[in-house]
């Protein structure tokens, strides 16, 4: 948890938080942003760093309540805590000493431009700062800007303070008055930044803008912050947020900013209506409760089945003529039901179904299914153990080769791997190996069969970057080999692409969580909200943090674009988003 040690209200919907986050503060630089999540049910909100104090271990953000979540955030009092404060994210601003530099902040953009002003002053640049607000009543930080500015000017839309008009009116005056301006930095609403960039274009002055206002997810995976810069597609949260304003396609960007406008408005209206209803009931307008996730439909409660099951009757010798020609069908949700939910479609085998399908395996002396499996599971072995109802041994065989049997049993493409090489499949339907793997893994849940390795610890430490399937498999193998393993995940939940890339009707989140919990029981440690490369670097891991090796498995998060017209339009998504 991250405590809010200072809260200040600047206007009706603008407020400041100073948050205790020592590691984030230590790694912060101008231009960085953080992702904030207030609680388990909250959404991720990107906030540009407005200030940081490495000595105090605090980071300051200035927030404007626009949607439901930011309105909820505005209700949090000083002294309360937020669940996640992830950062620093983005690429730090590249600043160097200039003869003269102009820093322009409009509205909320005043906050993120401040760290850049301070650093330029420390570098020895001659600083000219311009801040703009709708009126004097909404002004903030004019004292902080005056402290670090060689020249300080203010514009208000209504003329209640400083120059009447937009910041571009003042910027135009400054450009005409001063020679030797090496750079203009403009942060604020998109129309303001576009106007500043157009104003400086004829002067040939480098103009940097910050596109933090279009970010949603903060990792580049949602694609909401895509922006065309010159002839290239960029992601504001990964490649930015700072870009050359003369190269940014602002018209395209302003359309993209409206992408979720209707959804945000509807969500806020529902939130306000619910808050009003609760207030009328005398509950003080508390935040509406969020329902807990529903239980997935099932056809048999595997947890209710006994661990020790009587062995089956003696079976006859099997061959192609004696086994069932078709695989045992797996029950599924009725289409009329599943069209109205996101719960798992395939519901899994019952014990009788699993035994019937296991009986179709010929227990080949030279099985071709094993080399067809990428991790070399002893497939006849685990099916044989299942067939004699020794589920614990069947699970042991699976786990000895595969860290994630419940996941792989659901999403591994067995039809082109182990099942494609199944000898039964030469004449009949191949054995449903994946379905049997899933059954055994599901049966093992909650039975305590995942135990810490018995071998002696090696004394070695390994850091695993990312928590997707490659990382989890690596962590599982290393912990079994006696290595001390820590997994570092940038998001607030572990699972990587398993969580955010595969829908729950195909791979339920609770299945992923069970596999991760099994690894934790083996001794794997998970550090969430940790961005390796920003919060900690790999050289840091290998030196001061004492790791002997680092496995980097960050996945293929960035798509490749074709460079055709319309690629950045709303509604056009890449396969990675």
Question: How should each PLM-predicted stretch be described?
Answer:
Residues 1-80:
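Ferredoxin-reductase
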Residues 68-216:
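FNR/FR-type flavoprotein reductase catalytic core
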Residues 107-110, 191, 221, 403, ...:
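Residue-level detector of alpha-helix initiation sites
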Residues 136-143, 484-487, 491-528:
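Rossmann-like dinucleotide-binding cores of NAD(P)H-dependent redox enzymes
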Residues 241, 249-461, 509, 552-576:
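Ferredoxin-type iron-sulfur electron-transfer modules and their immediate structural context
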Residues 461-465, 513-564:
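Feature captures the FAD/FMN-dependent oxidoreductase FAD-binding
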Residues 462-486:
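N-terminal Rossmann-like FAD-binding beta1-loop-alpha1 element of flavoenzymes
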């Amino acid at each position: 948890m991250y405590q809010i040690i200072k809260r200040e209200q600047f206007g009706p919907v603008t407020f400041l938080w100073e948050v205790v986050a020592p590691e984030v503060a230590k790694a912060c630089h101008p231009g960085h942003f953080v992702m904030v999540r207030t609680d388990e049910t909250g959404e991720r909100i990107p906030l540009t760093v407005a200030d940081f104090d490495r000595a105090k271990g605090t980071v300051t953000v200035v927030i404007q309540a626009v949607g439901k979540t930011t309105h909820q955030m505005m209700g949090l009092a000083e002294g309360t805590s937020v669940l996640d404060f992830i950062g620093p994210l983005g690429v730090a601003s590249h600043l160097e000493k200039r003869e003269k530099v102009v820093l322009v902040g409009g509205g909320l953009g005043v906050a993120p431009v401040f760290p850049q002003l301070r650093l330029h002053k420390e570098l020895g640049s001659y600083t000219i700062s311009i801040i703009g607000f709708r009126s004097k009543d909404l002004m903030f930080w004019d004292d902080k800007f005056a402290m670090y500015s060689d020249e300080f000017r203010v514009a208000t839309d209504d003329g209640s303070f400083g120059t009447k008009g937009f910041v571009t009116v003042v910027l135009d005056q400054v450009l005409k008055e001063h020679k030797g301006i090496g750079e203009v930095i403009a942060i604020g609403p998109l129309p303001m930044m576009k106007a500043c960039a157009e104003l400086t274009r004829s002067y040939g002055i480098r103009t940097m803008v910050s596109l933090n206002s279009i970010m949603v997810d903060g990792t580049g995976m949602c694609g909401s912050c895509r922006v065309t810069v010159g002839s290239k597609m960029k992601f504001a949260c990964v490649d930015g947020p700072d870009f050359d304003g003369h190269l940014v396609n602002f018209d395209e960007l302003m359309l993209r900013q409206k992408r979720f406008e209707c959804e945000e408005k509807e969500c806020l209206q529902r939130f306000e209506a619910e808050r009003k209803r609760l207030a009328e009931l005398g509950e003080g307008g508390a935040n509406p409760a969020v329902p807990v996730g529903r239980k997935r439909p099932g056809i048999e409660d595997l947890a209710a089945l006994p661990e020790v099951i009587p062995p089956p009757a003696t079976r006859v010798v099997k061959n192609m003529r004696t086994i069932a020609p078709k695989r045992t069908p797996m029950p599924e949700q009725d289409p009329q039901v599943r069209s109205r939910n996101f719960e798992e479609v395939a519901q899994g085998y019952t014990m009788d179904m699993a035994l019937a399908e296991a009986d179709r395996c010929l227990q080949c002396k030279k099985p071709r299914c094993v080399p067809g499996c990428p991790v070399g599971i002893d497939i006849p072995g685990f099916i044989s153990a299942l067939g004699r109802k020794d589920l614990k041994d069947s699970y042991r065989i699976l786990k000895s080769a595969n860290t994630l049997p419940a996941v792989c049993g659901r999403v591994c493409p067995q039809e082109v791997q182990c099942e494609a090489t199944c000898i039964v499949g030469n004449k009949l339907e191949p054995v449903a190996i994946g379905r049997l793997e899933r059954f055994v893994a599901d049966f093992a849940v909650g039975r305590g069969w995942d135990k810490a390795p018995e071998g002696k610890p090696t004394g070695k430490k390994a850091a695993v970057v990312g928590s997707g399937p490659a990382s989890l498999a690596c962590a599982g193998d290393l912990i079994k080999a006696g290595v001390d393993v820590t997994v570092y995940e940038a998001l607030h939940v572990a699972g990587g692409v398993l969580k955010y890339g595969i829908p729950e009707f195909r791979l339920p989140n609770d299945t992923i969580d069970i596999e991760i919990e099994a690894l934790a029981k083996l001794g794997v440690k998970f550090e969430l909200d940790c961005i390796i490369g920003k919060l900690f670097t790999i050289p840091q891991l290998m030196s001061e943090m004492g790791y002997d090796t680092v496995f980097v498995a960050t996945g293929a998060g960035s798509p490749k674009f074709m460079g055709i017209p319309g690629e950045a339009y709303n509604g056009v998504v890449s396969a990675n988003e």
